[in-house]
């Protein structure tokens, strides 16, 4: 069994892949849904994802978890790989430091975005833009599930290579 098959099995065992009619965050609908909260709170899934992501990064990389779903993934991967991470908020908070990027980030630092699910890719692109505005160099994004609905292409338009652990096809073809 491949690493992809193992992860698909873990996602299904956590009941993270559901079928029915679902409204998605971008306003579209889908006959299936991948519940990030179920796979991100399942220790077997989270551990497998962190190990797979850690294998795909260099030791001098900083990770950036896209709030909310990318944060536990970035934290687990950073712990697994022994690298730092920052949090990319959807918008700057209106209190405290009012930062959009939380954590230590040096100018020119190489950052890899970590995201749970890519549908259109817009959330990841927004995080990339915020990180670049903060001085980071961002060329890669690690995604757990690529729904194969344009996310890879949108990220590529912004100069970011997407690496997904599983695709919608992997999830839907598995029985």
Curated annotation (Swiss-Prot):
It holds the Pfam family Pribosyltran. Gene3D superfamilies: 3.40.50.2020. The keyword Glycosyltransferase applies. InterPro entries: OPRT, Or_phspho_trans_dom, PRibTrfase_dom, PRTase-like. Pathway: Pyrimidine metabolism; UMP biosynthesis via de novo pathway; UMP from orotate: step 1/2. One of its GO terms (molecular function) is magnesium ion binding. It comes from the Archaea. Its cofactor is Mg(2+). It catalyses: orotidine 5'-phosphate + diphosphate = orotate + 5-phospho-alpha-D-ribose 1-diphosphate. One of its GO terms (biological process) is UMP biosynthetic process. Keywords: Glycosyltransferase, Magnesium, Pyrimidine biosynthesis, Transferase. Its EC number is 2.4.2.10. 5-phospho-alpha-D-ribose 1-diphosphate binds at residues 89-90, 93, 115-123. Orotate binds at residues 119, 147. Belongs to the purine/pyrimidine phosphoribosyltransferase family. PyrE subfamily. Homodimer. Catalyzes the transfer of a ribosyl phosphate group from 5-phosphoribose 1-diphosphate to orotate, leading to the formation of orotidine monophosphate (OMP). NCBIfam families: pyrE (TIGR00336). This is Orotate phosphoribosyltransferase. It comes from Halobacterium salinarum (strain ATCC 700922 / JCM 11081 / NRC-1) (Halobacterium halobium).
């Amino acid at each position: 069994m491949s690493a992809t098959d193992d992860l698909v099995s873990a996602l299904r065992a956590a009941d993270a892949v559901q079928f029915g009619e679902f409204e998605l965050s971008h306003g579209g609908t889908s006959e299936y849904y991948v519940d990030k909260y179920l796979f991100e709170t399942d220790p077997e899934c989270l551990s497998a994802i962190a190990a797979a992501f850690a294998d795909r990064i260099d030791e001098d990389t900083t990770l950036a978890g896209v709030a909310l779903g990318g944060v536990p993934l970035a934290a687990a991967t950073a712990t697994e790989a022994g690298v730092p991470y920052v949090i990319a908020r959807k918008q700057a908070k209106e209190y405290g430091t009012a930062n959009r990027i939380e954590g230590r980030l040096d100018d020119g630092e190489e950052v890899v975005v970590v995201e749970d699910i890519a549908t259109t890719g817009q959330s990841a692109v927004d995080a990339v833009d915020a990180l670049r505005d903060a001085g980071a160099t961002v060329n890669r994004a690690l995604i757990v599930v690529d729904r194969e609905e344009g996310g890879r292409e949108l990220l590529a338009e912004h100069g970011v290579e997407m690496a997904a652990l599983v695709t919608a096809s992997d999830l839907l073809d598995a029985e």
